Curated annotation (Swiss-Prot):
Its EC number is 5.4.2.11. The record marks H183 as: Transition state stabilizer. The lineage of its organism: Bacteria, Pseudomonadati, Pseudomonadota, Gammaproteobacteria, Lysobacterales. Catalyzes the interconversion of 2-phosphoglycerate and 3-phosphoglycerate. GO terms for biological process: gluconeogenesis; glycolytic process. It comes from the Bacteria. It is an enzyme of class 5 (isomerase). CDD domains: HP_PGM_like (cd07067). This is 2,3-bisphosphoglycerate-dependent phosphoglycerate mutase.
Length: 249
């Protein structure tokens, strides 16, 4: 019997709509983002998914997406676990910058490397930057040494994996059906891990907002199959839109 896991990237955020790098900045959803989250819930309901537990990050765009989706699923009562380890990749000094302006300044190739490569970090924020996570009380209990000032996708995977191993994998091994509402890069990290994707191929993997990605896993948590729910062509178009965000006009 296969285990079921759904990865759900949050709906469109206010900075997604403005084409800005977001990272750990706590930006809310647009109205379209709420609608995407609700539609995701309907798609999961149509699939007949009955979850046992849900996980999300400490950022409200993922939290609110989960809330909207669970309401549409009529599964608001589910236990929800939140962890900083599911936060978006920290984009360092790029956070808040317009992606098109950044591509015009540094070149599309460089921006694409910063956005989609596996092991290259963007420039870091300074320790005295007001947006440094150590100044955010939601991270007050964490050792400052673990708080990032920039991250590559590799760093993000190294951050996410302990939570996968300690919290999520044991639930799947207990035959629970699990929903994760998180972010483009924390989910790309899990996608890479689950599919054993190469460092080169992950460059071209783009996860669209608000479309559930259903994995069926074996009893050893190996991938049996995975697919986006709903219209596959719509998911492909949405992924292409994500890929084009870092291109100069």
């Amino acid at each position: 019997m296969t285990r079921k896991l759904v990865l759900l990237r949050h709906g469109q955020s206010q900075w997604n709509s403005m084409n800005r790098f977001t990272g750990w900045v706590d930006i809310g959803l647009t109205e379209q983002g709420h609608q995407e989250a609700t539609m995701a819930g309907h798609l999961m309901k149509e699939e007949g998914l009955e979850f046992d537990v849900a996980h999300t990050s400490l950022l409200k765009r993922a939290i609110h997406t989960l809330q909207d989706a669970l309401k549409a699923l009529d599964q608001d009562w589910l236990p929800i676990y939140k962890s900083w380890r599911l936060n978006e990749r920290h984009y360092g000094a790029l956070q808040g910058l317009d992606k098109i302006d950044t591509a015009a300044k540094h070149g599309e190739e460089q921006v694409n490397i910063w956005r989609r490569s596996y092991d290259i970090q963007p420039p870091p924020i300074d320790l005295d930057d007001p947006s440094h996570p150590m100044r955010d009380r939601r991270y007050a209990a964490l050792d400052r040494k673990v708080l990032p000032v920039t991250e590559s996708l590799k760093n993000t995977l190294e951050r996410v994996l302990p939570y996968w191993n300690d919290a999520i994998a044991p639930q799947l091994n207990d035959n629970k059906t699990v929903l994760i509402s998180a972010h483009g890069n924390s989910l790309r990290a899990l996608y890479k891990y689950l599919n054993q994707e190469s460092d080169e191929k992950i460059l071209n993997v783009n996860i669209p907002t608000g479309i559930p990605l259903l994995f069926e896993l074996s009893d050893t948590l190996q991938v049996v199959s995975y697919r986006y729910l709903g219209d596959p062509d719509a998911a492909q178009r949405a992924a292409e839109m994500v890929a084009n965000q870092g291109k100069a006009k």
